[in-house]
Amino acid sequence: MADSSFDVVSKVDRQEVDNALNQAAKELSTRFDFRGTDTTIAWKGEEAIEIVSSTEERVKAAVDVFKEKLVRRDISMKAFDAGDPQASGKTYKVSGTLKQGISSEDAKKITKLIRDEGPKGVKAQIQGDEIRVSSKKRDDLQAVIALLKGADLDVALQFVNYR
């Protein structure tokens, strides 16, 4: 019997983030407490989002609205990293980035967790910004998925190419 395997990745569906951003922008334009504050939310490059408002409280509230929209679209909060509000002239800005890929140190933590706490006979290999987990038994792979879902890691994980 051939080995079964799956890949552990950390990727965010950009279209879902774009939908959440558009929903947040629409809500910010119609909400009463944001009237007259010139609050905007927009893409800044490929992986960055910028939120601008007239006061620090409004920019923090706009970040909360955006995070709420991300959660409703099943995007993990671990995938979005928002900075602190910064004053620039008469406005306040928050720049946030989307985290894509598993860093080498996080990959090492995950493979160590699989080796230490996972079932015997499961192999985890780091392949760039993803991890390939393989085993002879599919039940062992399902146990590893449950282990990783239950672990408190700093990165949002998805499981793809399950074969």
From Swiss-Prot:
Gene source species: Mycolicibacterium vanbaalenii (strain DSM 7251 / JCM 13017 / BCRC 16820 / KCTC 9966 / NRRL B-24157 / PYR-1)
NCBIfam families: PRK05412.1
UniProt family annotation: Belongs to the YajQ family.
Keywords per UniProt: Nucleotide-binding
One GO CC term, this protein: cytosol
Name this protein carries in UniProt: Nucleotide-binding protein Mvan_0997
Alphabetical list of Gene3D superfamilies matching this protein: 3.30.70.860, YajQ-like, domain 2
PANTHER family in alphabetical order: UPF0234 PROTEIN YAJQ
Disulfide bond annotation, renumbered to this chain: none
Task performed by this protein: Nucleotide-binding protein.
Leader sequence segment: none
GO molecular function: nucleotide binding
UniProt cross-references to InterPro entries, sorted A to Z: DUF520, UPF0234-like_C, UPF0234_N, YajQ-like_sf
Pfam families found in the cross-reference section: DUF520
Keyword Nucleotide-binding: yes
